[in-house]
């Protein structure tokens, strides 16, 4: 787990699973920013850091984002992720998760 701090306050965090369920590639399990600290570049900084860590393990990075969270999906798309699949009912009945991936090699 990696955290973003402002002073001593945790304002966001991210958690990477080194060998996720998607062909053993690293998987971004969660990235979360306190609502009052969003749109300040903290999420981007945590994502960039997560990608640097993932690149030490593999050349691809995976994540899923829920269909009810289009803002998060757009965030990942702006940062080079593309949807590579859909997984209905992965975490909750009636919710589709979009499987997204990014090639980390430039």
Where is each model-derived feature located?
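Conserved beta-strand-loop-alpha-helix junction that forms the acyl-donor binding cleft
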Residues: 38, 63-73, 89-95
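Acetyl-CoA-dependent GNAT
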Residues: 1-36, 47-49, 53, 89
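Residues forming the Rossmann-fold NAD(P)(H) cofactor-binding site
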Residues: 44
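Terminal substrate-recognition subdomain of acyl/acetyltransferases
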Residues: 93-106
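Conserved GNAT acetyl-CoA-binding A-motif
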Residues: 47, 54-66
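Glycine-rich phosphate-binding loop
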Residues: 41
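Conserved active-site tyrosine of GNAT-family acetyltransferases
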Residues: 76-77, 81
């Amino acid at each position: 787990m990696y955290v973003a701090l402002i002073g001593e306050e945790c304002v966001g965090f991210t958690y990477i699973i080194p060998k996720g369920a998607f062909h053993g590639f690293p998987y971004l399990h969660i990235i979360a920013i306190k609502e009052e600290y969003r749109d300040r570049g903290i999420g981007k900084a945590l994502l960039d850091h997560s990608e640097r860590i993932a690149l030490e393990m593999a050349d691809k990075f995976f994540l899923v984002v829920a269909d009810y969270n289009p803002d998060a999906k757009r965030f990942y798309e702006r940062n080079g992720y593309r949807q590579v699949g859909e997984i209905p009912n992965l975490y909750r009945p009636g919710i589709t998760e979009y499987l997204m991936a990014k090639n980390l090699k430039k």
